[in-house]
């Protein structure tokens, strides 16, 4: 559960971490924020590139609900969620799910998504491996109340499917960031317009990198 005391501790830890890396935080704006990266699911892909920076075009144009990191900023990641969504790249009302909901992911697509949950995230920054293997399974969350014809999933988006990151990960907008989700094989089937969303929450430090 999020608390004011916990949020203050996260803020102070992030400030100390950024300062220890040689960046000035005395005149920088430090605020709570988030990053959101999306990539379309595919039956032919087992290695998904997770875009973080605003100028990352490896997967093509950015999707409408993404929130990327500006090159001038640093983001300290303190929580991560990996969820599944359904919607086109331009759908502003695309819904997110914390597990392969059988009401939405019909036929075999719900079972086939286990190849994603049996995979892992890995992160390399400036050719240095920062996160070798972060299991996606820790984000799998099935609520007590599940969706049916007359109900919707119970889901607290402030906590469910989010997992704390310690020590905090420094996402530097001026760095070469290679973020990947490695699935345990490509899904045999996928629902049309379904995608993976990686949401990072933490502290944003504005205008502190070498990029002006």
Task: Kindly give the residue locations of the regions a language model identified.
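Beta-strand-centric surfaces of beta-sandwich/beta-rich domains
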Residues: 1-212
